[in-house]
Amino acid sequence: MIVSMLVNGMYILPPCRIKSLVLLLSILIVIMGWAEACVGFLEQKHTKPFFLVAGFDNPHNICEYARSQNLPWGNIEDPPQNEWPGLPLNFAKNPYDADVISYEQSLNYSAYPTRNYTPDDWRRYRNLYYRLVEKVDAEIGKILNAIDKQDLWKNTAVIFTSD
C-alpha cells in the first residue's frame, strides 16, 4: 500500500510504499515522538535484529513560542524573571553584519517574529529553549532506561542526529 501522513499541513511521512500494516503503525507511532511506544517495543521479545527510530521535534517548538502559538506538546511554566538565563557575550549586533539580513527581517515579520525582541524577551526565549531541551532529554532518557532495563546494550547502537 502507498501511504503518507499530513499533520498541520506538513508531511511527517512522505508518500511511500509500505508492505505491512504493523510496520506502518510502528512508523507512525515513532514519528509522532512517543517515547512510551518505543519503550513498549523494546519490552517485547524479539527473535530477530531490529531497527528502531525515535524522532522528536523539540526544541524546534521554540518557533511556535516566537509566533505566540501554543506549544504542541504542552506549555512550559515560566519561572520568575530573575531565574532566566543571561544573554550571551555576542548578543549585541555586530557592526559588520550584512544589512541585507536586517532588511529581510523587516519585510517579513511572520518569518522573523523575534526581530523586535528586547533583551528581556531574549532571556525569556532562551529559558524556554533550555526547558524544551530538558523535555526532549527526558523523552530520550525513557528509551535509554528501557535499553538498560532490557539489557540490550551489547547489541545496540544509539545514534543521535540533529539538524
Residue spans for each PLM region:
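Active-site-proximal cap/lid insertion segments
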Residues: 44-48, 56-162
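Catalytic-site neighborhoods of secreted/periplasmic enzymes
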Residues: 1-52, 56-77
